[in-house]
Regions:
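Acyl-donor-binding surface of acyltransferase catalytic domains
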Residues: 1, 90-169, 310-315
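A conserved beta-strand-loop-helix scaffold within acyl/acetyltransferase catalytic domains
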Residues: 23, 29-50, 62-70, 194-258
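Conserved acetyl-CoA-binding loop-helix of GNAT-fold acetyltransferases
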Residues: 82-98, 258, 264-277, 299
């Protein structure tokens, strides 16, 4: 490349240029609504490294976002690709990781728990895959997003939600939307029985007042808290499902969980359908990200494979 880019931290002032860059560099993602969340938003581990590569005239050419050892995103404007900018940004992320955690830490691409744009490199992004392979990264796993039809789907209707809720009630359970008062019981239940990072996402889904970064996604969602819960006869929360805890505003579903001793009562289905009805009109409404139980989602909502991703890690 002729001129080495100037590297500096991304600031709120840079977000419009970053949104334009990401929309062109990452064609398979809806990036504009979540650019602030991805670049300046909080992470589960409370750390953040977000750097831009700028031309001498101040044009944003590329951006890298790192959280811990996870490379959340690396993007270069198409007009500036194949000039070494991506490599420079990757090297800056590597240097930051080495300085902060030690040389033995390995960069991992995409699947950052809690705040991720996508859980890996889209399988269709062949150039991106080649870029990482050429720089010593190897494939470690492939992951899947599903998408449930949210319109004209007999499995996703208010009538079906009422039926599922009624069945749960007959078994002694109450299914409802969560409130801010549920925040601490949810945190205790999730951290005690599921992945602690899920509590971070659920807190974000409950509402801006529970997020540590006051500038991030400051507006409430139209439906209110984006979490649905099931309570047993004692009033204890025994199941939950959330959406918009990650990629807020796009309508991504997850996480969800039911305590083992309360499974088999249709609670998960009721909570899933409640969430899918919430997100019917979002840009990515119906996306079920980073899926484990494919069969459950297929049976409960008619979800089908949508996108596949490759997760890379340094050798």
């Amino acid at each position: 490349m002729l001129d080495r880019p100037i590297l500096r931290a991304i600031t709120p002032h840079d977000l419009p240029a970053a949104a334009e860059l990401l929309s062109k560099a990452l064609p398979y993602d809806h990036t504009e609504p979540v650019v602030e969340e991805k670049l300046l938003g909080s992470n589960h581990r409370r750390d953040r490294f977000t750097t831009g590569a700028f031309s001498p005239s101040g044009e944003l050419l590329g951006v890298v976002a790192l959280a811990g050892r996870w490379l959340k995103l690396l993007a270069v404007h198409p007009s500036a690709q194949r000039r070494g900018i991506g490599t420079i940004l990757l090297q800056s992320a590597r240097a930051h990781l080495t300085a902060s955690t030690g040389a033995l830490s390995k960069l991992r691409v995409g699947d950052h728990p809690g705040n991720y744009l996508s859980p890996g490199v889209d399988e269709r992004s062949l150039d991106a895959q080649a870029f990482f392979r050429a720089r010593g990264f190897v494939e470690v796993v492939r992951v899947l997003n599903l998408r449930a039809p949210v319109h004209r789907n007999p499995l996703v209707t208010p009538e079906r939600l009422r039926k599922l809720t009624s069945v749960a009630r007959a078994d002694g359970y109450t299914v409802r939307r969560a409130t801010l008062a549920d925040a601490e019981p949810l945190h205790q239940m999730i951290t005690g029985s599921f992945a602690p990072v899920w509590s971070f996402e659920v807190a974000r889904a409950l509402g801006p007042s529970l997020r540590s970064d006051a500038t991030e996604c400051a507006s409430e969602l139209p439906e209110g808290p984006a979490v649905h819960v099931a309570l047993d006869g004692t009033g204890a929360i025994v199941a939950f499902a959330a959406h918009d805890g990650n990629n807020r505003g796009l309508g991504w579903f997850g996480p969800m969980g039911t305590l083992e001793q309360h499974r088999g009562h249709g609670l998960g289905e009721a909570l899933l359908i409640g969430c899918l009805l919430d997100v019917a009109d979002r840009p990515d409404g119906g996306v079920i990200a980073w899926v484990g139980p494919v069969g459950f989602y297929s049976r409960a909502s008619g979800a089908v494979p949508d996108r596949r991703f490759v997760v890379f890690e340094e050798q």
